[in-house]
Amino acid sequence: MSLNNSSNVFLDSVPSNTNRFQVSVINENHESSAAADDNTDPPHYEETSFGDEAQKRLRISFRPGNQECYDNFLQSGETAKTDASFHAYDSHTNTYYLQTFGHNTMDAVPKIEYYRNTGSISGPKVNRPSLLEIHEQLAKNVAVTPSSADRVANGDGIPGDEQAENKEDDQAGVVKFGWVKGVLVRCMLNIWGVMLFIRLSWIVGEAGIGLGVLIILLSTMVTSITGLSTSAIATNGFVRGGGAYYLISRSLGPEFGGSIGLIFAFANAVAVAMYVVGFAETVVDLLKESDSMMVDPTNDIRIIGSITVVILLGISVAGMEWEAKAQVILLVILLIAIANFFIGTVIPSNNEKKSRGFFNYQASIFAENFGPRFTKGEGFFSVFAIFFPAATGILAGANISGDLEDPQDAIPRGTMLAIFITTVAYLGVAICVGACVVRDATGNMNDTIISGMNCNGSAACGLGYDFSRCRHEPCQYGLMNNFQVMSMVSGFGPLITAGIFSATLSSALASLVSAPKVFQALCKDNIYKALQFFAKGYGKNNEPLRGYILTFLIAMAFILIAELNTIAPIISNFFLASYALINFSCFHASYAKSPGWRPAYGIYNMWVSLFGAVLCCAVMFVINWWAAVITYVIEFFLYVYVTCKKPDVNWGSSTQALSYVSALDNALELTTVEDHVKNFRPQCIVLTGGPMTRPALLDITHAFTKNSGLCICCEVFVGPRKLCVKEMNSGMAKKQAWLIKNKIKAFYAAVAADCFRDGVRSLLQASGLGRMKPNTLVIGYKKNWRKAPLTEIENYVGIIHDAFDFEIGVVIVRISQGFDISQVLQVQEELERLEQERLALEATIKDNECEEESGGIRGLFKKAGKLNITKTTPKKDGSINTSQSMHVGEFNQKLVEASTQFKKKQEKGTIDVWWLFDDGGLTLLIPYILTLRKKWKDCKLRIYVGGKINRIEEEKIVMASLLSKFRIKFADIHIIGDINIRPNKESWKVFEEMIEPYRLHESCKDLTTAEKLKRETPWKITDAELEAVKEKSYRQVRLNELLQEHSRAANLIVLSLPVARKGSISDLLYMAWLEILTKNLPPVLLVRGNHKNVLTFYS
């Protein structure tokens, strides 16, 4: 519906007497016509104008009406349409989404296209207008190029890449099934297996009618709970192909899904062999009766099974439509066979059938068969283990979820109805056969007795037959002895044989289709990269032909074994493991309380699902304990494999949801615990900027926070807020991904601020959560401070003051080459861009077959490749490698090497700790933590403390005692008694030359000039200031001399950071202190804690 064709949107949607308001489109260039329209409106309309500019474009007229009609209009879908004549290209004059309640807005009404392609939904994806687009100011007279989202939203078509993505979905003629043919039929055929015809009567004979019904109901309980869980998961969003694998993987994640998906697909493949061999055994029995054996029973099973599986493969490869038709035909045969049995129970039995134990419905037989009579070696659980595989097959419909028209409706309805119908059939057959057939019969028609003679109390005796000798010798007939009881009871025996054929072939066909479908879905997710070959589909239905061939080969291999007694329990356990995980998935998703868990199918309970999972695990051990152990071992191995490989998928699993809930609960629980010195951990804010730009600073911090503390990489975007926020938001995910890729256990946080100091101040105050708040600020040393603008120096020193104000410790790290490698990264990005352009250009030339031009271009690149240049490329570990491609310079090469120095294992050496001032112990704790790391374990601690020359030995003993109480191992302790002596003249001269450009020298000038200079350059170092802190300046210079003397060969120096009292020491003088203190030394950590204890010797 176009607004150009109708000036009244709502009049086209609902009757005029119920319209609530009217939207009339008015030509912007013809205000006169607008005025005319205003005059023609019905007098009972209440008109509201929204400003002069809005009045020129549209008019909203409210009409009386009820809410119901209004809601009906909104639900009709018209509001989701847009007028192609109103374009989003003019950001000022045109109206956007004019039908969105008649407002001049870019806001879009809710549409399903906005929610597509979110990890589980296929179909065209449209992007709604972003928050910035509808929030930012509109620039007048600016032509905006329409985005793909705009074109789709305005009905102008789907972008090309999205069309390609959804080509498969848009293909005509794709076969999709409803809930009857797709789920109900398949589940019924898979559940009604050969057990129904040749084992159920034996189960009733062993367990009796009472326990037999209990066995059926117990099996049904397992399948029903699993069916409810399956229905809940299947209705919690759009379901793709993959069946049980898809449900489990999207609920519990790739680790569980990938492990169970592989064994579930394998189990279905082997199940094909199991059902085909069951069919072949029946055929071989018929051949025996007619004396038509080909070779021998075993080889005949192999021959018939091989031929059968080839035929089934042909039906499957022909397409799902042919396979579905075959399934319907087999179901009809099966239903006729079941009906034939029930009809046979009411047909009067002849003498031959009576001699075999069939007497029609008799109360005496029902009473006699009601209780159990287990033979030697059998019991309730052994009989249950034999029957339970007959109840499996409930996932046959879910396994082809990708071929269903509406999986969310079909899977719950078809699965639960199939369970109900098949359970009723099993119960009916069990009760009927138990009420009609005795347990033992001789089959001899001469075993009759005269009426009135003394009976042995058996039901058969009362009915004129004496089968008492079956107590002493084996008999061939009766529930306990004859597996063909249903064929005997039925009205026409060959129909039961046809039913057996139908049950086995239909189950084999369903498994032959399910296995490749599940396997293809698993391979498409690329969890096992080696199996990607089998992800390819063919034809309009995306048939997994490669998977069919693999399933055929597996089935053929097990058919050739021709003995299923060993593999059948493993198959059943594989299926049960899938059922257990489906139930656990439903419980886990409910327990995680994720807002995304909103199944449309509400008939489930999380605790019932958990009970079902436990029940499935118990049944696995009841059926076969060693098969259950094998299943768990295989699943555990695959789980560990997938976990180690860390597949790059994000399905919003309940495992992720529970991780969030656990983290939230733990964080809240932590707030109730008071801080204790024994639980202190370094929780650091690291001013790295982008994490990849200062890797060395991040590496050294990560070395003492990994697995023991919090590390937050912080970046401050300085500048206009609009630009900064845009840049910040666009890079956050990339930088956090870089941390994950490089296996750095840290968070990334960023703020936008007008100045650097304000941003850091915000981070210091607002970062963290509860008890997990930063207590240490880590920054790199500002190496270029003498060339930097004054504001940068003020900000740098200012953030140190701010940290101390917030009672946060400070760590300043200095290395000789500095930390910032952003220029190197820019060169790397430029090289990558040029390389991509070169490859694209060469590909274009090759495609166009322009040989002459191609030769010229390639020659150009070939010459360029001979230049002696250095290219930087990233290694797998995230470090930077250098190779000859472009000139970066010797300095950059050293910088690149320095950026990786803390990634490497440190050579055997020392960490020298100059613990000059007691800051609570942080200066000692950080190097101790470093020595616990693998990369630093060969470095020993040497402790240096200040003292008096005449008490060196006593103070050394005292410090050794303190360190022992702290349980900190050290290699040596040095007491420095000459810290306070003046440095030599050469060292002091270096310091004076350093600060000379920043001195005011007011004492050499008259008072007026000096005061004027102080006002104009308040940042300079005054003579009075320098004189007041002269002793402290001496100390910094002297400390550098001592560091050069004692620690020049150390791997790392950890040194107490001098504190500059606010208002007493200028920023430039403080920077000069730091410079002279750490000049020409190995890597240095200047550390100052917040003067609260972080070490204790109490237990």
Swiss-Prot record:
Modified residues (Phosphothreonine): 95, 100, 105, 118
Expression sites (tissue/organ): Kidney; localizes to the thick ascending limbs (at protein level).
Chain ranges for the short sequence motif RFXV motif as given in the UniProt record: 20-23
Annotated positions of the Phosphoserine modification: 61, 91, 120, 130, 148
Entry keyword annotation includes Acetylation: no
Keyword Cytoplasm assigned: no
GO-annotated biological processes: cell volume homeostasis; chloride ion homeostasis; chloride transmembrane transport; monoatomic ion transmembrane transport; monoatomic ion transport; potassium ion homeostasis; potassium ion import across plasma membrane; sodium ion homeostasis
Glycan attachment points: 446, 456
Effect of residue 20 to A: Abolished interaction with OXSR1/OSR1 and STK39/SPAK and subsequent phosphorylation and activation
Disease: Bartter syndrome 1, antenatal: A form of Bartter syndrome, an autosomal recessive disorder characterized by impaired salt reabsorption in the thick ascending loop of Henle with pronounced salt wasting, hypokalemic metabolic alkalosis, and varying degrees of hypercalciuria. BARTS1 is a life-threatening condition beginning in utero, with marked fetal polyuria that leads to polyhydramnios and premature delivery. Another hallmark is a marked hypercalciuria and, as a secondary consequence, the development of nephrocalcinosis and osteopenia.
PANTHER family in the cross-refs: SOLUTE CARRIER FAMILY 12 MEMBER 1, SOLUTE CARRIER FAMILY 12, CATION COTRANSPORTERS
Protein name as catalogued: Solute carrier family 12 member 1
Gene of this entry: SLC12A1
